[in-house]
Regions:
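Short interaction-hotspot residues at assembly and binding interfaces
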Residues: 1-3, 11-65
Length: 67
């Protein structure tokens, strides 16, 4: 991925939630140096990375073991 763009937790939720995914991804015609379907894929992958980070932080706070 070219330039790194920061994605908020709220943006990641909107992309990953089936109820809001289509509308959220509409604005991602350009993302991370990509365009079109590659930009949508890059945004979705970044949303997944954000979600994984949040879940790992949650597990650490709960005393679980992150992977």
């Amino acid at each position: 991925m070219g330039e790194q763009q920061k994605m908020t937790i709220e943006e990641a939720i909107a992309i990953l939630d089936p109820e809001t995914r289509r509308a959220a991804l509409f604005g991602y015609r350009y993302f991370g140096g990509f365009r079109g379907s590659e930009a949508v894929l890059a945004a979705t992958e970044e949303a997944c990375r954000v979600a994984v980070r949040v879940m790992q932080e949650y597990l650490e706070k709960k005393g679980g073991e992150p992977t």
